[in-house]
Design a protein with these regions (language model features):
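Conserved active-site segments centered on acidic
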Residues: 1-81, 146-149
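Helix N-cap/beta->alpha junction signal
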Residues: 15, 89-90
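Phosphate-binding/catalytic loops
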Residues: 84, 90-149
Length: 149
């Protein structure tokens, strides 16, 4: 079982989009029984809140439901539980360090570093551009799945 945790600031936009896009890609590839995929926040601001409505709508446009998902904060145990901890931006990486300390097992990376366009996934909470975030996350998850197959 390959265990992947996607992480962003609040766990209401980018990381749940990544979680559900990856679940969709894995399902379409017939690999659902080989993956455990989840998402979490580095902050406490949105704990218990559902996925932000514009992010829900963007997923729904592509036939993907995130119904029932609520934000949770990552924990130190997540480093032990998951094989891959995938951050959306450099700020997430810095904030993750308070939970995981170092990364001796080399489990932590940026999503876009798995593509030909390394860097950050812009936060649509601030940009308002959920389409650009969709495109980046889809590209990142597609590349990550290819690596993990």
């Amino acid at each position: 079982m390959i265990k992947v945790l996607f992480i962003c600031h609040g766990n209401i936009c980018r990381s749940p989009m990544a979680e559900y896009i990856m679940k969709d890609l894995v399902s379409k590839a017939g690999l659902s029984d080989q993956f455990e995929i989840a998402s979490a926040a580095t902050s406490t601001e949105e704990i218990g809140n559902p996925v932000y409505p514009p992010a829900q709508r963007k997923l729904a446009e592509h036939g993907i439901s995130c119904e029932g998902k609520t934000a949770r904060q990552m924990t130190r145990r997540d480093y032990e539980t998951y094989d891959y901890l995938i951050a959306m931006d450099h700020n997430n990486l810095r904030n993750m360090a308070r939970f995981v300390g170092g990364d001796p097992e080399h489990k932590v990376s940026l999503l876009m570093d798995h593509t030909r366009r390394p860097g950050d996934v812009a936060d649509p909470w601030y940009t308002g551009d959920f389409e650009a975030t969709w495109q980046d996350v889809l590209e990142g998850c597609t590349a990550l799945l290819e690596e993990l197959r």
